[in-house]
Amino acid sequence: MHVNEMRPDEVRALIRKGEITGPTAGMAGGFTQANLVILKKELAFEFLLFCQRNQKPCPILDVTDPGSPVPSITAPDADIRTDFPKYRVYKRGELADEVTDISSLWEDDMVGFLIGCSFTFEQALMNNGIPVRHIEEKRNVPMYQTNIPCVPAGRFQGPMVVSMRPVPEEQAVRAVQVTSRLPAVHGGPVHIGSPEAIGITDIAKPDFGDAVTIKKGEVPVFWACGVTPQAVAMHARPELMITHSPGHMLVTDVRDEQFGVL
């Protein structure tokens, strides 16, 4: 069976066994995927406030109880220590390690935040005949740090990160309509067109993920991205912060359509 047709729990089981270690775009089609941020309880409120003030890049889907690795609302049989294909470990704002299991790092005062992911609306784009280039090219989605500032909260501040998908010019309006229905997974784009206008100097060199082909007659469309907390971590420099590796998400049990507003 192709991973696109698997149930979320089947995908998570393969990830837990180490049989899937790559990006999760297109897996368990129709189910919501989530970004991850893990912090010590003492920083959890500040980060929650940061997300509340920056709902476009950081729409919260679930928050674990302190010390619990179980996202009880979105995937009650999942374990956030093992069920992402790859994690990043930041120490004092520096990327210290990239691992496939964080069980050995888990402590009983940690809180996990699951943040909506734009992979969720890709099925809706494809259902509307809008191509998703990184899936076509079997690459990770390109992501860029911008000059768009987030609203600060305590020690958390920094620039917004965006993901980019090339869209045929005549379908750009439809892409806005389709994704605006799903505000819990970033919603409509934050920018269409000139990358330079939002501080991206070279679209062929993403800060995270992989470059993709932009064809003649296509326009780059940028959506707020849940990798934003990783850029913010580099500014806030918490003692320890664990995140997913960009593109390597948790596949939840929640269907995409449950987040639709129209």
Swiss-Prot record:
The keyword rRNA-binding does not apply. This is Putative hydro-lyase BLi00500/BL02808. Signal peptide: none annotated. SUPFAM superfamilies: PSTPO5379-like. Coiled coil: none annotated. Disulfide bonds: none annotated. Pfam families: D-Glu_cyclase (PF07286). One of its GO terms (molecular function) is lyase activity. Its EC number is 4.2.1.-. Belongs to the D-glutamate cyclase family. InterPro entries: D-Glu_cyclase (IPR009906), Putative_hydro-lyase (IPR038021), UPF0317 (IPR016938). It is an enzyme of class 4 (lyase). It comes from the Bacteria. Keywords: Lyase.
